Amino acid sequence: MKDLLNLLKNQGQIEEFDAIRIGLASPEMIRSWSFGEVKKPETINYRTFKPERDGLFCAKIFGPVKDYECLCGKYKRLKHRGVICEKCGVEVALAKVRRERMGHIELASPVAHIWFLKSLPSRIGLLLDMTLRDIERVLYFESYVVIDPGMTTLEKGQLLNDEQYFEALEEFGDDFDARMGAEAVHELLNAIDLEHEIGRLREEIPQTNSETKIKKLSKRLKLMEAFQGSGNKPEWMVLTVLPVLPPDLRPLVPLDGGRFATSDLNDLYRRVINRNNRLKRLLDLAAPDIIVRNEKRMLQEAVDALLDNGRRGRAITGSNKRPLKSLADMIKGKQGRFRQNLLGKRVDYSGRSVITVGPTLRLHQCGLPKKMALELFKPFIFGKLEGRGMATTIKAAKKMVERELPEVWDVLAEVIREHPVLLNRAPTLHRLGIQAFEPVLIEGKAIQLHPLVCAAYNADFDGDQMAVHVPLTLEAQLEARALMMSTNNILSPANGEPIIVPSQDVVMGLYYMTREAINAKGEGMAFADLQEVDRAYRSGQASLHARVKVRINEKIKGEDGQLTANTRIVDTTVGRALLFQVVPAGLPFDVVNQSMKKKAISKLINHCYRVVGLKDTVIFADQLMYTGFAYSTISGVSIGVNDFVIPDEKARIINAATDEVKEIESQYASGLVTQGEKYNKVIDLWSKANDEVSKAMMANLSKEKVVDREGKEVDQESFNSMYMMADSGARGSAAQIRQLAGMRGLMAKPDGSIIETPITANFREGLNVLQYFISTHGARKGLADTALKTANSGYLTRRLVDVAQDLVVTEIDCGTEHGLLMSPHIEGGDVVEPLGERVLGRVIARDVFKPGSDEVIVPAGTLIDEKWVDFLEVMSVDEVVVRSPITCETRHGICAMCYGRDLARGHRVNIGEAVGVIAAQSIGEPGTQLTMRTFHIGGAASRTSAADNVQVKNGGTIRLHNLKHVVRADGALVAVSRSGELAVADDFGRERERYKLPYGAVISVKEGDKVDPGAIVAKWDPHTHPIVTEVDGTVAFVGMEEGITVKRQTDELTGLTNIEVMDPKDRPAAGKDIRPAVKLIDAAGKDLLLPGTDVPAQYFLPANALVNLTDGAKVSIGDVVARIPQETSKTRDITGGLPRVADLFEARRPKEPSILAEISGTISFGKETKGKRRLVITPNDGSDPYEELIPKWRHLNVFEGEQVNRGEVISDGPSNPHDILRLLGVSSLAKYIVNEIQDVYRLQGVKINDKHIETILRQMLRKVEVSESGDSSFIKGDQVELTQVLEENEQLGTEDKFPAKYERVLLGITKASLSTESFISAASFQETTRVLTEAAVTGKRDFLRGLKENVVVGRLIPAGTGLAYHSERKRQRDLGKPQRVSASEAEAALTEALNSSGN
């Protein structure tokens, strides 16, 4: 018995380990794993079904087929355990050993391992310094390779074909050694002296000048050092022994009908064994060379197919023409070992069913069908029945449950009480996709779900299914209750706003009950308290919308958290008074004294949570839901065709627009405007008309005429059903109503260009055939987009999770001083995001001073909450430096202070929170809502007409930012810089709005001027780009020869002539390299200079520029010399939506990126080359100038002699994030990427907190490139983890050596995931083969720091409750280890001990 217990004990033992190392296996190692050699290709005997001896399923090698029973049956039972049968040679043991015992095949000739050969870059090729092509020719027996040249003129590693080989043989006899096949490669690898080679390479690298050569050499050096450091030997990349997988992992299962299903691996192994045996026989027979060679080649191919079928040549196919699944295929891809079995497993104690509404449930409950519960909780029920003595054995209990006896239901109810279950809806896009509920037993077969959690699950009841899981252990139940209960997840982790927000019917009901109507029944009544209102309403004395006076007893929670009672009389409506009955104590009446739209309800719940806490908010949310359902039923809102009221002005607006379009058409016909201008104008026109129609329609819908108590006719807000739905936010939007009752508007073609003819009809009037046909474009594109979008969005989330999975909060404070500068995000005239919203929940990095003084009002280290936000607003603070994940200095992980508030909990983030995964989910989850392109509403194109002026919204003081301008004769300013901005500041000096001013804008105000709201302060022509003079003078044309560089156009109507610069492509040969220009001269004919420089005032004209002046005309400052027509707007396909987000996270370089100045200095142009201009920037401090060749077609924003600062835009275009990082630093990059990504999400109305994007950015900035190696072990140009460089530099600092210098590098998320320190995480993400090959060669260790690695090896993850477990284990390990002390410390301790004992 004792033995049995010991045996069982051994089985359950888990191995403790801290890291996993992967390496190459030596032949000795493979033999040591093996339990015997597989010599025959046979599997099992077809008559007896017993495994053949020495075959692929041999029991002698791999173990017995039945537990404790040898093959011939001589020894049976446990008592013979460990005996080896003398007849059949099988050891008596558990049959389970067939899953773990390996065999081996002794190969008659060495075989190269295909992974190290073909996985790029080829490791074997790098080591031998041969190309992959050459090595393959040797391996597959096409050429000889010289192994030992002896005293001949040949070189080691030289390739010889047959002729050359035989010539060499005749010439030198056997002074040299040249062979072919894997043996030759094995010999060459064996002969490498790593020490010597590494020394040689280290000397060679500093002496080479060519970049490519250095790259190649450092690659080789890295690989050699990896081999040297890891203890792998190069010759192990060529196999002489092949391991054989345990048979139970490649099973052979009998099907009915006498056939067998087998794993593909058996076929592949069989091929190898057959060819190997044949080769042995041929070698014994001393067969002719050519035959042996062919056989060796076939053996190499067979082993290739076994390891990675299809990597070289055609994949070997089975009987049914599909390629066989090799060992490599087993682990990679979605169906591979990593993703199918290690990262996600199917679990027991789970079930799934359709969901339906449970409007009567409480928030923490879900309805669970009895049948399901009975099955899920079976073991618990058996235990209870037995414990109660109702059943004597488990078998009896099982019978009772199967018969469904009445006492079983009682026991079930008891078991389920207080036992939470987890509900999950696929796709689980964020952590709220799994929540815990207390089950309530219900009849029927569908799970009932509380309506308020639908938003979190993104569930609806049109046939969605959900899965139920039972947490078994006490700890699991505890976590489910404390962390995952739906009542604990009121706020969304993405933005910190409530996610338990009523929608649709509930909103409709609450909105309906809080609306007011003029002259409703009971208007003007006064009530003593809420109960009286209730009675009046129920008895029909007062209508729900009647305006009444009510005496309210409200309890208000003060700053100190105490409730103070307050009684007052308020003007309100009956419905609002009724709603106040469910509002928890502590909130004032004003929160419900308004019509409750969706936004207001969300605000109310948020406010409630912050004021009265979690418990009351949950109860309140439930009450709101019940109330909302009740009153939406009472309201009886429905939609009929008559609700779509078409505005009377529609016809007038459309006729006016049509006339204008005709006018533009005639201008085009007479050549006044170009095709592009016509197109732009027409589209602007219709966009405007559409807006007017929808304004008229909304105005029309939102008001209705009623008679008040005095008998006068007055306007009141309409009770039109459709208007109420849209207005309350229950369903529908203005854009949709516009299509129903206004006009459908402009449509886009599939390629994104807008069709000029709009659809003037709406759905109520109905569409004609042409209009219907135009509509189909958008509708179909919408459907196609949706299908693509879902897949793309899921893939984006997967990449994000993978890059950020190991980012966990590991300490409270990293002590950094750095942070990001936050200011309100102002776009156009609007403050898109005020400062308060951006800093809420962040920690201040540097003291905030009162504007205009040096009094500290917020000390560094303060966590900004709602109260502080209000305070900053009151103190009119404009910018704050906050801690950020990007600047956090924690080595592994991130610190709580840099992260700030845990958005889903509302307090500082806990240690152990997996902030990386939360960030990834928060960004990925709304991905499906992002369109693929940005401009669709059912195909209706939304394009605002191009801005041509700045009209300020608020009054205030004008501020001009980095605006270069000249003053025109009439006193107006003309902008001559591109980065100029105009801002309006209020009386406190806070910026309220900010606008970009394009080049050539005419500005009618000056710095410091006061303006009134609505004033137009700047104007420009949006369709052309002017060139403005900066001095007075006379025009002189340079290189403007008619018919060669320019062509003259005369307008028939006006008789004016324009000169148009020809495109270099269309010019005759003589004009190709001439650059037409306009220069300014004085009366004496001397060149005028630009003010403040010694550069002549000369303006080069790009292709298609139009000049209206004649040679010799007089111009004054600020005049326009030439116009460049701007391109038509093809809804300037800003890659919208999802692709844009993916591009930013992948850090892709845009096609034609903007060109930034590399250094600060003065611009000049050097000698031109064919098709390119040479731009030279000369620094003002006299250091070396910087040169860059720029294609001639790029339109430059700078003129000769202009001063630029490092990082300024020289030529417009989409920004390249890598340039921003290199020239402007990390914080500018962070600002750019955060704003760009937020713009995409904001367009869709999705709110995501900045810190999630910053968290991902931190992971993208993990790597640095070594620019100078100093005394470190890094090589210049190496990409290494920032933490590695910092650690090594610290080490070097203590030894007074030179540290390495480095530049930060931005990696895209895919690349960053693949270059993580953990090879398990990288291999389970993508490119499994490549990752594992690289890891094996370098002998990598995975310290299992991230979440993914720990899931794969089946441990608790080092986050959340698992972090405590991991740190405890680490502490235990450290206790076991002796502490390391330096010699000096030991000496000091010793002397101290001696001294003290001496006393």
Curated annotation (Swiss-Prot):
**Gene Ontology biological-process entries:** DNA-templated transcription
MF terms per GO, please? DNA binding; DNA-directed RNA polymerase activity; magnesium ion binding; zinc ion binding
List of residues binding Zn(2+) 2: 814, 888, 895, 898
Q: Where does Mg(2+) bind?
A: 460, 462, 464
GO (cellular component) term, any one: DNA-directed RNA polymerase complex
What exactly does this protein do?
Answer: DNA-dependent RNA polymerase catalyzes the transcription of DNA into RNA using the four ribonucleoside triphosphates as substrates.
Note the subunit structure. Answer: The RNAP catalytic core consists of 2 alpha, 1 beta, 1 beta' and 1 omega subunit. When a sigma factor is associated with the core the holoenzyme is formed, which can initiate transcription.
Gene name linked to the record: rpoC
Do you know which NCBIfam families this protein is assigned to?
Answer: rpoC_TIGR (TIGR02386)
Which residue intervals are annotated with compositional bias (Low complexity) in the record?
1382-1399
Quote the EC number. Answer: 2.7.7.6
Residues at which Zn(2+) 1 binds: 70, 72, 85, 88
Report the cofactors. Mg(2+); Zn(2+)
A Pfam match is: RNA_pol_Rpb1_5
* Disordered, as annotated region: 1367-1399
Q: Which SMART domains match?
A: RPOLA_N
Under which name does UniProt file this protein?
Answer: DNA-directed RNA polymerase subunit beta'
Assigned keywords, A-Z: DNA-directed RNA polymerase, Magnesium, Metal-binding, Nucleotidyltransferase, Transcription, Transferase, Zinc
Q: Which reaction does it catalyse?
A: RNA(n) + a ribonucleoside 5'-triphosphate = RNA(n+1) + diphosphate
The Swiss-Prot or TrEMBL record describes its family as follows: Belongs to the RNA polymerase beta' chain family.
Q: How is the cofactor bound?
A: Binds 1 Mg(2+) ion per subunit.
